[in-house]
Each structure stands twice: as structure tokens, then as C-alpha cells.
Amino acid sequence: MKKTIMTRFGEVEFDPENTVLFVDGLIGFENLRDFIVMPNRKNGPLFWIQSVEEPDLAFVLTDPTNFFLDYKVVPDARERAKLGIGTDDDCHALAVVTVPPDRKVTLNLMAPVLFAPATNRAIQVVLEKSQYKTRHPLPA
């Protein structure tokens, strides 16, 4: 049965069976766990995740390999357990996008979102000893 929420994008209808469960929430938003994926109205590599519990909250995400071909995150056993997947299951690393007033877009490559399509679960992890930053600028 479809549900409807009022968001910054207007009224959005969604199927609760298709929500993405953020097992531990997102950093700073640990109490929010259910999100829906919303495509960007403009064609391109960016998309939105919209909180179901807090309709005013949405984040822009992207596949960082669109900009950094060598970016790779391999989930460890603990992370795979949280995602409910085995070693052979797909897991996508996504980056939270920041678009400040000066329009100098950055990606949070130090704390990627790991998404498991098989279970519709996601977690945000912090990479230790990373060469990347929380506000990593896009390549010129």
C-alpha cells in the first residue's frame, strides 16, 4: 500500500516496501533510518535520498567513481553483516554531495554510504587512514 509524505519537493508517493533502511542512520542523523531514493530532475550523476520520518530532510548522493575512477571501498565482515549480505553480493559506495552557496561542489569521500541492493540496506562508514576528505573537491 502506497504512502504519501509532503517534502521540499512537494507531495511524494512511495511504496514502504522500497524504502532504503539505514541500519545506523546517517552521521548526525542516527535516529532517521528510512529513506526513499528520488531521481534528480536534471539528467546527471546526482540523486536524492529523502527521509520518510523527517520530510524536510534530504541528501544529494552520487557514485564517486563518476569523478574519481580509482575510488573503491570494500566492506569488511562487520559491515557486510549490518547490510545483510555475503562476500559475493553487490555493495555500492556512494558519496554525500555538498553544494555550498559558492557552488564549489564537494563529495564526502571519507564517510561513504555503502548500499546493498539485495537487501535495500545502507550504512555510512568512516574510512580510517584515508587520503580522502569529508569535503573533497571535484577534479578540475
UniProtKB/Swiss-Prot annotation:
InterPro entries: Flagellar_assembly_factor_FliW, Flagellar_assmbl_FliW_dom_sf. It is found in: Cytoplasm. Pfam families: FliW. Its main location: cytoplasm. GO terms for cellular component: cytoplasm. The keyword Heme does not apply. GO terms for biological process: bacterial-type flagellum assembly; regulation of translation. Coiled coil: none annotated. The keyword Chaperone applies. Keywords: Bacterial flagellum biogenesis, Chaperone, Cytoplasm, Translation regulation. Belongs to the FliW family. Acts as an anti-CsrA protein, binds CsrA and prevents it from repressing translation of its target genes, one of which is flagellin. Binds to flagellin and participates in the assembly of the flagellum. Interacts with translational regulator CsrA and flagellin(s). This is Flagellar assembly factor FliW. It comes from Syntrophotalea carbinolica (strain DSM 2380 / NBRC 103641 / GraBd1) (Pelobacter carbinolicus). The gene is fliW.
